[in-house]
């Protein structure tokens, strides 16, 4: 024990032994301590400070105390420190302790008593809500005697006023999620695209009503209000032939304001040739006589107003059934006019004269005898009631 406590005395007591020299040397030359080390780094420049350090980083750390510099910052609380060890100690003592308590509180499971209290509270709240929604005019009353019996952490229940029926009905509807709204919008857009992309087939030719039903004419003396009629005959077929089927009658615009333009399907047809010859010889309606005798003989057809000669057979276009009534009723003055026209004409079956002088004389006589009830042909080309094209 004495050897360990006091080396000097131990060396003296053991001097009789042979090991005296070694013990005395060990006692005289002890190990070099930190304080006994050589301190080469001294603090200079600051009055009253005479400290010295063995390492340069220790001197720099000491100088920060004089300057007040704190380069080390805590990332959690943004607090600055002058030494790294102080920052490390701060984080371990302050922030690590807080994190440990927060994680332990999250991991702690609720006790059975808390679960029972929460279930009872939820059942009471559901019962109160059901009673409040069942009767719209009922209110829950709270007894003042039961107030002290409640726990301190529980809040006093509020008086629940019942809402009107229309509000309760809207509350019972489940909330609409954004996904359901998105799905409904997608369905609506898809339906709209299907409606827009529905195939629409255009007809190969425009739909036209070639047999437009005009109103039937009244028992008026004039016949100028009738629609114009275009007669079309087949290719290279005589209109007087009985073997061929009846020709088509196409009703054009009502009423014509000017000379109607005739369209021909084939240039070599009979009606096209007749029109070209009429245009070539400049035949006017004033130079053509109207045969009114055939109207009385054949009530279901008209005689053609334009005929190049008496030898050519007359064309008898077929009138549609809805127009037969209008053409079957002759005007009032047809008989007198026919008699006068037959007297002026000389012979009953003769319609035209071969010479221009006879045509002029006949026109002068017939212009006085024809009345308004006959089929009138306007010479000024403003209005033409019925147009017949003959070969």
Swiss-Prot record:
Induction comment: Repressed by glucose but is activated in the presence of non-fermentable carbon sources or salt stress. The latter transcriptional activation of NSF1 is partially dependent on the SNF1 signaling pathway.
Low complexity bias (residue ranges): 110-134, 332-344
The keyword Phosphoprotein is annotated on this UniProt entry: yes
GO cellular component, one term: nucleus
Species per Swiss-Prot/TrEMBL record: Saccharomyces cerevisiae (strain ATCC 204508 / S288c)
One Pfam family here: zf-C2H2
Biased composition (Polar residues): 1-27
Compartmental location: Nucleus
Gene3D superfamilies: Classic Zinc Finger
Identification of the protein by name: Nutrient and stress factor 1
């Amino acid at each position: 024990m004495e050897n360990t406590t006091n080396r000097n005395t131990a060396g003296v007591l053991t001097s009789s032994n042979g090991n005296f020299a070694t013990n005395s040397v060990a006692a005289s030359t002890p190990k070099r301590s930190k304080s006994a080390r050589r301190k080469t780094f001294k603090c200079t420049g600051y009055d009253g400070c005479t400290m010295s350090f063995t390492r340069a980083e220790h001197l720099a750390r000491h100088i920060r105390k004089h300057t007040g510099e704190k380069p080390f910052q805590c990332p959690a609380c943004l607090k600055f420190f002058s030494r790294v060890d102080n920052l490390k100690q701060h984080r371990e003592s302050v922030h690590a302790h807080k994190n440990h308590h927060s994680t332990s509180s999250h991991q702690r499971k609720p006790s059975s008593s808390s679960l029972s209290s929460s279930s009872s509270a939820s059942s009471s709240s559901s019962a109160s809500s059901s009673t409040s929604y069942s009767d719209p005019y009922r209110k829950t009353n709270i007894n003042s005697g039961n107030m002290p019996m409640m726990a301190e952490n529980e809040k006093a229940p509020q008086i629940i006023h019942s809402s009107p029926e229309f509000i309760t009905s809207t509350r019972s509807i489940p909330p609409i999620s954004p996904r359901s709204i998105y799905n409904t919008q997608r369905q609506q857009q898809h339906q709209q695209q299907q409606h827009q992309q529905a195939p629409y087939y255009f007809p190969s030719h425009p739909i036209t009503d070639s047999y437009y039903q005009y109103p039937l004419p009244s028992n008026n003396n004039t016949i100028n209000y009738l629609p114009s009629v275009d007669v079309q005959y087949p290719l290279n077929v005589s209109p007087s032939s009985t073997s061929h089927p009846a020709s088509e009658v196409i009703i054009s615009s009502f009423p014509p304001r000017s000379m109607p333009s005739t369209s021909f399907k084939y240039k070599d047809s009979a009606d096209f040739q007749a029109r070209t010859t009429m245009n070539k010889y400049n035949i006017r309606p004033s130079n053509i006589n109207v045969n009114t005798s055939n109207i009385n003989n054949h009530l279901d057809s008209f005689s053609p107003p334009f005929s190049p000669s008496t030898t050519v057979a007359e064309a008898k276009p077929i009138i549609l059934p809805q127009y037969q009534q209008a053409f079957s009723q002759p005007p009032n003055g047809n008989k007198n006019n026919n008699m006068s026209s037959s007297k002026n004409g000389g012979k009953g079956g003769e319609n035209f004269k071969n010479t221009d002088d006879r045509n002029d004389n006949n026109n002068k006589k017939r212009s006085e005898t024809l009345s308004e009830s006959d089929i009138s042909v306007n010479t000024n080309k403003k209005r033409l009631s019925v147009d017949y094209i003959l070969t």
